[in-house]
């Protein structure tokens, strides 16, 4: 694994209900995962907006799901809201060709991006509004908390910075190297704590936590790169990091300690979200990152209290999880038996 692999999620879309008995695992001494038990989850196909590929990114306590999907007969993809079996196209900014939804809060407000830069946007009761960031720089909104605070990144080329948007005011969160290096914010909890990653002046990329105006370097699992993707109400942080041996492993950071969550079915694991109960979701298996297709053999997982449970698919050869709500409902994407990638929902039986 090259040590310079960037862990940041790109803007590119990576892209039958079924029930299966899955395998639960716990990390062993060598960082991999050992078989310990079996658990049953139901995988539900949420479909697409007519095209052959869709991915679910987030789910709120009410079970509303957001993500993006290709449209029928076009190369365009649009943000969607799925609720009670119905997937709704959220549209784009005027003249826009694509949009994507990255997060949804308990009130149903959705954030993401839309073509035209792209630019960070928020959907409120179906009304799409562009967030005011800085000049005409591209931007993307990655998460929104119950208070309506939004985080993401803005900028292009040599300068990309994390931002916090609150009640119409945008704050540049800075980086580990001031204005000279890049940063991105990916998640925010109810307390307003923000996580993401930042370059350092020495050229490394580290997971970071912003809390009360202070940025904290969360370190790595021994390599030179890490990236945080989720934070719980209690301040537990999840993400992925290069290890000393050059593999990418999921981590859980709590009270100053970063723990390797191990892998299953291959050398790779990536954590993408965490809920209030400390349940962590992501994907594990062969060494293929998001945007690199096809990730044959990868499986979505949920990790809790040292146990990694590998989830099933919609009949195809891979699945990935990207979000989890307080009820433990998990969303992501999976290959179907028909060879399409559909948005997916996993629930515990």
Give the positions of each predicted feature.
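Residue-level hotspots at or immediately adjacent to binding/recognition sites across diverse folds
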Residues: 20-349
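C-terminal motif of bacterial Sec signal peptides marking the signal peptidase cleavage site
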Residues: 15-17
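Bacterial N-terminal signal peptides that target proteins for export
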Residues: 1-8
């Amino acid at each position: 694994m090259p040590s310079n692999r960037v862990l940041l999620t790109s803007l590119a879309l990576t892209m039958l209900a079924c029930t299966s008995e899955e395998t639960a695992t716990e990390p062993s001494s060598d960082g991999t995962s050992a078989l310990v038990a079996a658990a049953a989850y139901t995988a539900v196909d949420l479909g697409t907006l007519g095209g052959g590929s869709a991915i679910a990114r987030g789910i709120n306590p009410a079970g509303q799901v957001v993500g993006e999907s290709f449209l029928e007969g076009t190369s365009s993809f649009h943000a969607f809201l799925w609720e009670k079996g119905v997937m709704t196209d959220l549209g784009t900014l005027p003249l826009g060709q694509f949009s994507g939804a990255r997060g949804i809060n308990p009130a149903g407000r959705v954030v993401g991006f839309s073509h035209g830069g792209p630019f960070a946007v928020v959907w409120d009761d179906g009304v799409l509004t562009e967030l005011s960031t800085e000049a005409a720089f591209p931007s993307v909104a990655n998460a929104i908390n119950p208070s309506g605070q939004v985080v993401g990144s803005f900028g292009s080329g040599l300068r990309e910075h994390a931002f916090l948007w609150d009640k119409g005011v945008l704050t540049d969160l800075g980086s580990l190297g001031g204005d000279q290096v890049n940063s991105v914010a990916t998640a925010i909890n109810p307390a307003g704590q923000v996580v993401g990653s930042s370059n350092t002046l020495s050229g490394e990329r580290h997971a970071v936590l912003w809390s009360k105006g202070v940025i904290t370097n969360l370190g790595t699992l021994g390599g030179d790169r890490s990236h945080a993707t989720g934070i719980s109400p209690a301040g537990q942080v999840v993400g992925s990091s290069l290890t000393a041996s050059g593999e990418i492993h999921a981590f859980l950071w709590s009270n100053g300690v970063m723990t390797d969550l191990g892998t299953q079915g291959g050398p790779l694991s990536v954590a993408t979200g965490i809920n209030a109960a400390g349940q962590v979701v992501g994907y594990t298996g062969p060494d293929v990152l998001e945007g690199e297709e096809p990730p044959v053999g990868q499986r979505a997982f949920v990790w809790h209290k040292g146990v990694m449970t590998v989830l099933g698919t919609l009949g195809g050869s891979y699945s990935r999880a990207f979000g989890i709500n307080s009820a433990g409902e998990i969303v992501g994407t999976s290959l179907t038996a028909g060879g399409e990638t559909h948005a997916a929902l996993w629930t515990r039986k």
